[in-house]
């Protein structure tokens, strides 16, 4: 087995009938024996441990659910557990019944690829009946309050039409009352408009003849803008000047010049007196 250069190269297949030497053998992960390419599967070499991790699922005829059989357990016991605990016969119709197109005489089953929902009626249809005229679309759904409004309007119309047939005088009285209401509302609007116009005219006349200008500082009233300006210059400007009299002033020791800002005084001494501050 192998060659003089590689004595361990290749192994014989474990199947008694085969015993073929394979230079790339396969080792079974269950029985840990060596096999050739033709006998590498569990069924080909009849592996005694091949069903340990085997997954076998049986479809229940009552609920159409998958039942997984345990290799280390009797299938009858597994089936009894499913029937007693997890089996639901009502699920059979949901799982087996396929959805069809709602159009009469259409036998097309609706799947993921051939289903289109109508934007107006929100119902699923097949590709053949996807347009509204093909499936007699009733149109978009009406809102409930729209129906309430339409019913209320029909009731009002019925109430108004019934007395018209029985008593024509009542219809004339109702129309006259409506006209009177319209006239009264129009008169009220006109009176309000007249009051607003009169108020504006009074305000403009008071501007021309009365006291309209008010001082923002003391609240004094004046008949013209010029008098208001004179008042501000005489009274309030003087008060500002008097208040500014309390500001500290720094005096130059050489020329007795006053400065409000000490920085300006230092710059003046360095510029005019060449940096000397001798008295």
Curated annotation (Swiss-Prot):
Q: Which GO terms describe its molecular function?
A: zinc ion binding
Q: Which residues bind Zn(2+) 4?
A: 118, 121, 135, 137
Question: Which positions bind Zn(2+) 2?
Answer: 28, 31, 45, 47
- Where is Zn(2+) 1 annotated to bind? 13, 18, 36, 39
Q: What is this protein called?
A: Zinc finger AN1 and C2H2 domain-containing stress-associated protein 11
Q: Does the keyword Metal-binding apply?
A: yes
Q: What does this protein do?
A: May be involved in environmental stress response.
Which SUPFAM superfamilies does the protein's record reference?
Answer: AN1-like Zinc finger (SSF118310)
Q: Where is this region: Disordered?
A: 152-178
Tell me which residues bind Zn(2+) 3: 101, 106, 126, 129
User: Looking at the keywords, is Repeat present?
Assistant: yes
Keywords tagged on the record? Metal-binding, Repeat, Zinc, Zinc-finger
Where is this chain compositionally biased, Low complexity type?
169-178
* InterPro entries (UniProt xref): AN1-like_Znf (IPR035896), Znf_AN1 (IPR000058), Znf_C2H2_type (IPR013087)
Q: Zinc finger, AN1-type: residue spans?
A: 7-55, 95-145
List the C2H2-type ZnF regions, as residue ranges.
Answer: 213-236, 250-273
């Amino acid at each position: 087995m192998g060659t003089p250069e590689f004595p361990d190269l290749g192994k014989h297949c474990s199947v008694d009938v085969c015993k073929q030497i394979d230079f790339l053998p396969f080792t079974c992960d269950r029985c840990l024996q060596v096999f050739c390419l033709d006998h590498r599967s569990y069924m080909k070499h009849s592996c005694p441990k091949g069903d340990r991790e085997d997954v076998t699922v049986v479809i229940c005829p009552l609920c159409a659910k998958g039942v997984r059989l345990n290799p280390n357990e009797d299938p009858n016991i597994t089936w009894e557990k499913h029937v007693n605990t997890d089996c639901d016969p009502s699920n059979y119709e949901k799982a087996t019944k396929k959805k069809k197109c709602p159009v009469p005489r259409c036998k097309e089953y609706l799947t993921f690829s051939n289903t289109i929902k109508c934007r107006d009626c929100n119902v699923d249809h097949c590709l053949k009946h996807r347009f509204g005229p093909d499936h007699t679309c009733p149109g978009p759904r009406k809102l409930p309050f729209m129906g309430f409004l339409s019913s209320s309007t029909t009731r009002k119309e019925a109430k108004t039409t019934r007395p018209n047939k029985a008593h024509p005088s009542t219809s004339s009285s109702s129309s006259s009352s409506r006209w009177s209401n319209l006239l009264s509302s129009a008169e009220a609007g006109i009176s309000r408009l007249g009051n607003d116009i009169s108020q504006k005219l009074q305000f403009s006349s008071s501007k021309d003849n009365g006291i309209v200008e008010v001082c923002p500082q003391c609240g004094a009233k004046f008949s013209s803008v010029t008098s208001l300006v004179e008042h501000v210059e005489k009274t309030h400007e003087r008060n500002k000047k008097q208040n500014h009299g309390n500001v500290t002033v720094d005096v130059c020791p050489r020329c007795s010049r006053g400065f409000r800002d000490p920085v300006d005084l230092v710059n003046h001494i360095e510029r005019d007196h060449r940096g000397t501050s001798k008295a």
